């Protein structure tokens, strides 16, 4: 979720896509065809961003085995029709077949160009090759990191993520997740109203930041405040913080 959102331009559409992704990963959205139709008609997004989102939706939403592949995703993931990209994509695919973890796949993929990575996604999308879901997500995240890096014109560093756009998006995703956890924990306790209030404020903040677009550093405080509030609330409730670290 974090990586994919880091390549979507700020605006009302980003907030909408964030909600769709959240629903998809939570298993709430099970109509892949409707989701793809919605994605296809979104304005602003580049064909490649649509292709990556379509790939993620297809990986995550359970669907009928024979469901037709979508042309707009295939076209976006063909490596600009460059045969070099396709050659590299095949080499990368062979390496990915040997990987079993998300991090292993991401590490391998990061040494390839965006065109080769997109072509490799295309191979998997068109069912010309199969990898585990973990590995496919490693490929997606490597591609998004490269795109976000080129947008930020910063150099990738393998050990840690230094890209402020990705860190910013990660903090907002964390804030949303924490807000959701607070709402679930609130239940019928006396402090429920307070918890719901804090969670609701956090959601509104995240939505506003995604819609308006803010400086990547501006989300640090949001995440920290929310975690502080959650910790204080949990201490009063006598609940362990373990789940949300």
From Swiss-Prot:
<dbReference type="InterPro" id="IPR036039">
    <property type="entry name" value="Flu_matrix_M1"/>
</dbReference>
<keyword id="KW-1048">Host nucleus</keyword>
<dbReference type="GO" id="GO:0016020">
    <property type="term" value="C:membrane"/>
</dbReference>
<protein>
    <recommendedName>
        <fullName>Matrix protein 1</fullName>
    </recommendedName>
</protein>
<dbReference type="InterPro" id="IPR015423">
    <property type="entry name" value="Flu_matrix_M1_N_sub1"/>
</dbReference>
<feature type="region of interest" description="Membrane-binding">
    <location>
        <begin position="1"/>
        <end position="157"/>
    </location>
</feature>
<dbReference type="InterPro" id="IPR015799">
    <property type="entry name" value="Flu_matrix_M1_N_sub2"/>
</dbReference>
<dbReference type="InterPro" id="IPR001561">
    <property type="entry name" value="Flu_matrix_M1_N"/>
</dbReference>
<dbReference type="InterPro" id="IPR013188">
    <property type="entry name" value="Flu_matrix_M1_C"/>
</dbReference>
<keyword id="KW-0694">RNA-binding</keyword>
<dbReference type="GO" id="GO:0003723">
    <property type="term" value="F:RNA binding"/>
</dbReference>
<comment type="function">
    <text>Plays critical roles in virus replication, from virus entry and uncoating to assembly and budding of the virus particle. M1 binding to ribonucleocapsids (RNPs) in nucleus seems to inhibit viral transcription. Interaction of viral NEP with M1-RNP is thought to promote nuclear export of the complex, which is targeted to the virion assembly site at the apical plasma membrane in polarized epithelial cells. Interactions with NA and HA may bring M1, a non-raft-associated protein, into lipid rafts. Forms a continuous shell on the inner side of the lipid bilayer in virion, where it binds the RNP.</text>
</comment>
<feature type="region of interest" description="RNP-binding">
    <location>
        <begin position="158"/>
        <end position="245"/>
    </location>
</feature>
<keyword id="KW-0472">Membrane</keyword>
<dbReference type="Pfam" id="PF00598">
    <property type="entry name" value="Flu_M1"/>
</dbReference>
<dbReference type="GO" id="GO:0039660">
    <property type="term" value="F:structural constituent of virion"/>
</dbReference>
<dbReference type="GO" id="GO:0042025">
    <property type="term" value="C:host cell nucleus"/>
</dbReference>
<feature type="short sequence motif" description="Nuclear localization signal">
    <location>
        <begin position="94"/>
        <end position="98"/>
    </location>
</feature>
<comment type="function">
    <text>Determines the virion's shape: spherical or filamentous. Clinical isolates of influenza are characterized by the presence of significant proportion of filamentous virions, whereas after multiple passage on eggs or cell culture, virions have only spherical morphology. Filamentous virions are thought to be important to infect neighboring cells, and spherical virions more suited to spread through aerosol between hosts organisms.</text>
</comment>
<comment type="similarity">
    <text>Belongs to the influenza viruses Matrix protein M1 family.</text>
</comment>
<keyword id="KW-0468">Viral matrix protein</keyword>
<keyword id="KW-0946">Virion</keyword>
<dbReference type="GO" id="GO:0055036">
    <property type="term" value="C:virion membrane"/>
</dbReference>
<comment type="subunit">
    <text>Homodimer and homomultimer. Interacts with NEP. Binds ribonucleocapsid by both interacting with genomic RNA and NP protein. May interact with HA and NA. Cannot bind NP without genomic RNA.</text>
</comment>
<dbReference type="Pfam" id="PF08289">
    <property type="entry name" value="Flu_M1_C"/>
</dbReference>
